[in-house]
């Protein structure tokens, strides 16, 4: 039985979405148990034999500064959910709340793994091969050193192997402005050197430099970048997908003939829209912590939040934390000062 601690108050829609998603998730996952964290008066209508309400009197808003969430709201649903992981009551916590606050709370309560300087946010983007490409970091670390990017690559490999059984040596690409080794700034060039060394020692399957379009081609399993670039790529991809879907709908409504064409093409269009629906890829892992935490989009609807729960459940069931620890320990000689001494 896998137990998830769910921050039911977080996100733009709060319990209205999170509770409905939790109910659907429980119906489809008989080996899962949920700790529903939030204000009891908002959660009182939820009853299920595999769900338990954990009271929390405060809520971290999407606008709360990190210091407010961390130091003043010590009984927030977000913090109490992460505390369940620290205490061993749950294997993973899930929240749609304020990203900065969640990262700060998770890092404060759970601490980073030995060998990791900074946690990273990782999620998946759909690709042309019918699968998904894992991209990290997506905003936790705007400025990164080459050593940080190497750590992200090691953690990303562990995540992909946990999500996709049989993919023990996923291909890693370094996001750059060109495939050539001479391209990129000094941090990227140095990162390339470290990743090639990791490949030579058998710690990573490094493909080489990749460009932005390779994310969607499915050229590699994992794309590594700093948080600034990753967040821009994520938001741009979601915007393009929404634009294409919207444009198709407009064009098929243009005349009686296009409406007839839409009816004929409906099965293909339906499958295409499903593949491009970013809600189905919701759920970003906060990697590098001594516990599992997943971040959902703040604007997530029921479908999207359920997907975040599913992704969190799958990684916990497939021992993501142990996989990250193992890969980091194996790559310790390459990871820099953080790997040389245990965390306090």
Swiss-Prot record:
- Assigned keywords, A-Z: Cytoplasm, Lipid biosynthesis, Lipid metabolism, Phospholipid biosynthesis, Phospholipid metabolism, Transferase
- Fetch the InterPro entries from UniProt: FA_synthesis (IPR003664), Phospholipid_synth_PlsX-like (IPR012281)
Q: What Enzyme Commission number(s) does the record list for this chain?
A: 2.3.1.274
Q: Name one GO cellular component term.
A: cytoplasm
| Pathway(s) | Lipid metabolism; phospholipid metabolism
Q: Which domain of life is it from?
A: Bacteria
Compartments where found? Cytoplasm
- Report the SUPFAM superfamilies cross-referenced here: Isocitrate/Isopropylmalate dehydrogenase-like
**Whom does it interact with, and what assembly results?**
Homodimer. Probably interacts with PlsY.
The free-text function statement in the UniProt record for this protein reads: Catalyzes the reversible formation of acyl-phosphate (acyl-PO(4)) from acyl-[acyl-carrier-protein] (acyl-ACP). This enzyme utilizes acyl-ACP as fatty acyl donor, but not acyl-CoA.
Can you tell me which family this protein belongs to? Belongs to the PlsX family.
Q: What is this protein called?
A: Phosphate acyltransferase
Q: Which organism is it from?
A: Paracidovorax citrulli (strain AAC00-1) (Acidovorax citrulli)
The encoding gene is plsX
């Amino acid at each position: 039985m896998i137990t998830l601690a769910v921050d039911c108050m977080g996100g733009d829609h709060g319990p209205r979405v999170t509770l409905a998603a939790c109910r659907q998730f429980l119906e489809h996952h008989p080996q899962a148990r949920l700790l529903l964290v939030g204000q009891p008066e908002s959660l009182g209508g939820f009853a299920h034999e595999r769900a338990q309400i954990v009271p929390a009197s405060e809520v971290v808003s999407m606008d709360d500064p990190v210091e407010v969430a961390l130091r003043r709201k010590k009984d927030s649903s977000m913090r109490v959910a992460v505390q369940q992981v620290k205490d061993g009551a749950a294997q993973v916590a899930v929240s749609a709340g304020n990203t900065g606050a969640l990262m700060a709370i998770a890092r404060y309560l759970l601490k980073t793994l030995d060998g990791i300087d900074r946690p990273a946010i990782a999620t998946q983007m759909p690709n042309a091969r019918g699968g998904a490409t894992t991209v990290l970091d997506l905003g936790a670390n705007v400025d990164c050193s080459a050593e940080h990017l190497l750590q992200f690559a090691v953690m990303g490999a562990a995540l992909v192997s946990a999500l996709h059984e049989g993919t023990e040596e996923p291909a890693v690409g370094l996001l750059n402005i060109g495939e050539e080794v001479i391209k990129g700034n000094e941090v990227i060039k140095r990162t390339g050197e470290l990743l090639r060394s990791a490949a030579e020692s058998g710690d990573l399957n490094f493909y080489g430099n990749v460009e932005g379009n390779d994310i969607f081609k499915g050229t590699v399993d994992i794309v590594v970048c700093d948080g600034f670039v990753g967040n821009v790529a994520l938001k741009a991809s979601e915007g393009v997908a929404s634009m294409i879907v919207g444009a198709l709908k407009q064009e098929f409504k243009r005349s009686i003939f296009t409406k007839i064409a839409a009816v004929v093409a409906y099965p293909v269009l339906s499958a295409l829209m499903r593949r491009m629906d970013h809600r189905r890829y919701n759920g970003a892992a906060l990697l590098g912590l001594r516990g599992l935490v997943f971040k959902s989009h703040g604007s997530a609807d029921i479908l999207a939040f359920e997907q975040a729960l599913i992704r969190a459940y799958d990684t916990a069931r497939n021992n993501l934390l142990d996989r990250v620890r193992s890969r980091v320990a194996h790559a310790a000689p390459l990871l820099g000062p953080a790997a040389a001494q245990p965390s306090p």
